[in-house]
């Protein structure tokens, strides 16, 4: 049989332990039983408190050093621009200029895909939408357009489009 005084002392000790644990809520562990994990960089041995911080730091080892750029050890990046021969707009890459040149080409395929400027093309007709009695929008097209006579296709650069 267990004595009543023994049970009473066990309850008192348990209650005291609970009160001591509750009094430490929000404080760092002093006894070192559950230490925070430390993440160390394998390159420079710098320590971080989170894996994400270590990952961001590790990425900095992969970037080129700014000191090498300032001392001129790295090759100088050539900054060239590619101007459009028709309208003069400049592009940083030749590929962008090639995409831009499509704007100057005749999209209808007439004149063999030659370059034309928009100022020399006839004004496009605007299609108006009207509501019919049923409430639907209907496009009104003017089919009585005449041929464009004497269209001068001489470009500003002196080349003639055939």
UniProtKB/Swiss-Prot annotation:
Predominant subcellular localization, coarse grouping: nucleus
SMART domains the UniProt entry points to: ZnF_C2H2
Entry superkingdom: Eukaryota
Effect of disrupting the coding gene: No visible phenotype under normal growth condition, but enhanced tolerance to heat stress and increased sensitivity to salt stress.
Expression sites by tissue: Expressed in roots, stems and flowers.
GO cellular component: nucleus
Keyword Ribonucleoprotein: no
InterPro entries xref list: Znf_C2H2_sf (IPR036236), Znf_C2H2_type (IPR013087)
Induction: By H(2)O(2), cold, drought, cold or heat stresses, wounding, cucumber mosaic virus (CMV), exposure to high-intensity light and low-oxygen conditions in roots.
C2H2-type zinc-finger residues: 39-61, 82-104
Pfam family, one: zf-C2H2_6
GO MF assignments: DNA-binding transcription factor activity; transcription cis-regulatory region binding; zinc ion binding
GO BP terms in the entry: cellular response to hypoxia; cold acclimation; hyperosmotic salinity response; photosynthetic acclimation; response to chitin; response to cold; response to heat; response to light stimulus
Localization per record: Nucleus
Keywords: Metal-binding, Nucleus, Repeat, Repressor, Transcription, Transcription regulation, Zinc, Zinc-finger
Biological role stated in the UniProt entry: Transcriptional repressor involved in light acclimation, cold and oxidative stress responses. May regulate a collection of transcripts involved in response to high-light, cold and oxidative stress.
Miscellaneous remark of the record: Plants overexpressing ZAT12 show thick and dark-green leaves with round shape, short petiole, elevated amounts of anthocyanins and enhanced tolerance to high-light irradiation and oxidative stress.
UniProt-recorded name of the protein: Zinc finger protein ZAT12
The organism of origin for this protein: Arabidopsis thaliana
């Amino acid at each position: 049989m267990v004595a009543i005084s023994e049970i009473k002392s066990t309850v008192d000790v348990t209650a005291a332990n609970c009160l001591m644990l509750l009094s430490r809520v929000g404080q760092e562990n002093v006894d070192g039983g559950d230490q925070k994990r430390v993440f160390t960089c394998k390159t420079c041995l710098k320590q971080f408190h989170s894996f994400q911080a270590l990952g961001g730091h590790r990425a900095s080892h992969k970037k080129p050093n700014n000191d090498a750029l300032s001392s001129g050890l790295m090759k100088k990046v050539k900054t060239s621009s590619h101007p459009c021969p028709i309208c003069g707009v400049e592009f940083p890459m030749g590929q962008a200029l090639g995409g831009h040149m499509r704007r100057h080409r005749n999209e209808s395929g007439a004149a063999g895909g030659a370059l034309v400027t928009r100022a020399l093309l006839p004004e496009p007709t605007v299609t108006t939408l009207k509501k019919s009695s049923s409430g639907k929008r209907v496009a009104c097209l003017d089919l009585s357009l005449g041929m464009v006579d004497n269209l001068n296709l001489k470009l500003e650069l002196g080349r003639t489009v055939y």
